[in-house]
Amino acid sequence: MTTRMIILNGGSSAGKSGIVRCLQSVLPEPWLAFGVDSLIEAMPLKMQSAEGGIEFDADGGVSIGPEFRALEGAWAEGVVAMARAGARIIIDDVFLGGAAAQERWRSFVGDLDVLWVGVRCDGAVAEGRETARGDRVAGMAAKQAYVVHEGVEYDVEVDTTHKESIECAWAIAAHVVP
């Protein structure tokens, strides 16, 4: 089967966004990219502090409420509909719930051919990137570095601790079925 979607999972500052841009460059066909960060940015600001939305704790923790979950589900269904209509889709996500988050995605994608990719990065390295970026809550990268991978099954895993995004993209691209 032809790969219709590539779903990358990794903690904050693991290097997913850079890999996505490199994948778009190295893959011969056009691939659309969507990330959980852009979903959050598309939501009204009140969703970023409301009890039912998404909350970023001072220690780097993230709490997800039912209103956020509902909108996230609608977003995922829309993205999957584009893949079913013929678009090739790359998803940049953070599976805060580990295996449960992957199962939610599985329920949306159904029988689509998906390449599941784990993007790992040492917690201390991710934390250093987080500090350099300056646009994340301190502690988020360290908290997410390992927990997002718990119980998740991948077709491909890459580690950005010592590898550049382009190297990781080439490794992932080798598993994409045209």
From Swiss-Prot:
SUPFAM superfamilies per UniProt: P-loop containing nucleoside triphosphate hydrolases
Family affiliation: To M.tuberculosis Rv2636.
Documented EC number(s): 2.7.1.-
Broadest EC class assigned to this enzyme: transferase
CDD domains associated with the record: CPT
Annotated source species: Streptomyces venezuelae (strain ATCC 10712 / CBS 650.69 / DSM 40230 / JCM 4526 / NBRC 13096 / PD 04745)
Residue positions of the active site: D37
Name of the protein: Chloramphenicol 3-O phosphotransferase
Gene Ontology terms, MF aspect: ATP binding; kinase activity
Recorded superkingdom: Bacteria
Ligand binding (ATP): G10, G11, S12, S13, A14, G15, K16, S17
Record key words, sorted: Antibiotic resistance, ATP-binding, Kinase, Nucleotide-binding, Transferase
Function: Inactivates chloramphenicol by catalyzing the transfer of the gamma-phosphate of ATP to the antibiotic's C-3' hydroxyl group.
GO biological process, one term: response to antibiotic
InterPro entries listed in its UniProt record: CPT, P-loop_NTPase
SUBUNIT field: Homodimer.
Claim: ATP-binding is one of the keywords in the record: yes
